[in-house]
């Protein structure tokens, strides 16, 4: 015989089951449905925003720039490939053309060859870029150079070279193309910065300085262009498995010529390019593409600066000891 207390407990349990079935579960599935619909609408808007858009990619001959150009081209954008090596750009153009048949409607890329390190080349290059399709929707400032060396050993010409390529070149190109965007009240400027635009690590001074400057400039530009309907996105990746360290400049201006450990263990350029594509499509403002520990370092730098400085000093000692051993 069931006692009154047991019967009461059973009734309570059944009531809870009924509430769960009639209220909580439908609510849960409803929320999931709304979220899925939101994601679908977001993807649809992103595709519409990027399809047929004129996208300029600097540093498109290799690494991240090449993969960015590839993913935007596959999405139906009209891509302008920029770089110093005309042969490499033409080969990449043929590669994209060969892959077009399996990717639906795509456009023949346009090639513009120039050197960001040459201040006199920027204005003519911008004019040539505008001649490709008549206007620019999205400018991806990707081209850059890295650096390895101690501050005390580095000649100032090296600092100037890194700043010219990583900061002054992109700034000059942005300023050259900006008036046409403002006139159309449409445009999107993307700066490929680095986590080292948010924190500085030892033996990367010139590179970190150029990326800090990049972050600051494009943050200012975003605010100033708000009323002109110009979007500005700053992307700050961590280590990417490319030849960036191999082609880095050293203290005396020579080529570093080695794939260092952190770069070798970095994310693939294909993955990062897809993340950049998604961020641009969603018109994100500031994107940090790093693993957990580097992301935490950014917060530690802000919330516990003394701890951050001790960590960096320890890293400097270890790296110096490793070089001297």
Curated annotation (Swiss-Prot):
EC number(s) recorded for this UniProt protein: 1.1.-.-
GO CC entries: endoplasmic reticulum membrane; membrane; nucleus; peroxisome; transcription regulator complex
Transmembrane segments: 18-38
Record: residues binding substrate: 194
Record topology, Lumenal segments: 39-325
Gene Ontology annotations of biological process type: adipose tissue development; brown fat cell differentiation; ether lipid biosynthetic process; inflammatory response; neutrophil differentiation; phosphatidylcholine biosynthetic process; regulation of cold-induced thermogenesis; regulation of DNA-templated transcription
Superkingdom classification of source: Eukaryota
Active-site residues per Swiss-Prot or TrEMBL entry: 207 (proton acceptor)
Binding site for NAD(+): 62, 64, 207, 211, 242
Location(s) in or outside the cell: Endoplasmic reticulum membrane
Function: Putative oxidoreductase.
Protein name per UniProt: Dehydrogenase/reductase SDR family member 7B
Organism annotation: Rattus norvegicus (Rat)
């Amino acid at each position: 015989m069931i006692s009154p207390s047991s019967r009461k407990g059973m009734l309570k349990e059944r009531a809870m089951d009924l509430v769960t079935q009639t209220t909580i579960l439908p609510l849960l599935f409803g929320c999931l449905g709304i979220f899925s619909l939101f994601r679908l609408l977001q993807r649809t808007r992103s595709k519409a925003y990027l399809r047929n858009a004129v996208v300029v990619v600097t540093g498109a001959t290799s690494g991240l720039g090449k993969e960015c150009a590839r993913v935007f081209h596959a999405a139906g954008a009209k891509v302008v490939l920029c770089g110093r090596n005309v042969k490499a750009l033409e080969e990449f153009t043929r590669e994209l053309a060969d892959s077009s048949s399996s990717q639906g409607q795509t456009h023949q890329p346009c090639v513009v060859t120039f050197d960001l390190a040459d201040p006199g080349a920027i204005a003519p290059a911008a004019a040539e870029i505008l001649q490709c399709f008549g206007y620019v929707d999205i400018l991806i400032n990707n081209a850059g150079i890295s650096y390895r060396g101690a501050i005390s050993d580095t000649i100032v010409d090296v600092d100037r070279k890194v700043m010219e390529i990583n900061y002054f070149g992109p700034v000059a190109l942005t300023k050259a193309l900006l008036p046409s965007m403002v006139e159309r009240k449409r445009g999107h400027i993307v700066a490929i910065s680095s986590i080292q635009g948010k924190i500085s690590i030892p033996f990367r001074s010139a590179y970190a300085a150029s990326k800090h400057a990049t972050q600051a400039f494009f943050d200012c530009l975003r605010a100033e262009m708000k009323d002109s309907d110009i979007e500005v996105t700053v992307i700050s990746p961590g280590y990417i498995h490319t030849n960036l360290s191999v082609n880095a400049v050293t203290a005396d201006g020579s080529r570093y010529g080695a794939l260092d450990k952190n770069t070798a263990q970095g994310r693939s350029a294909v993955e990062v390019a897809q993340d950049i594509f998604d961020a641009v499509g969603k018109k994100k403002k500031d994107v940090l593409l790093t693993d957990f520990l580097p992301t935490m370092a950014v917060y530690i730098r802000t919330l516990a600066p003394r701890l951050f400085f001790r960590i960096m000093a320890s890293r400097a000692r270890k790296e110096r000891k490793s070089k001297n051993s």
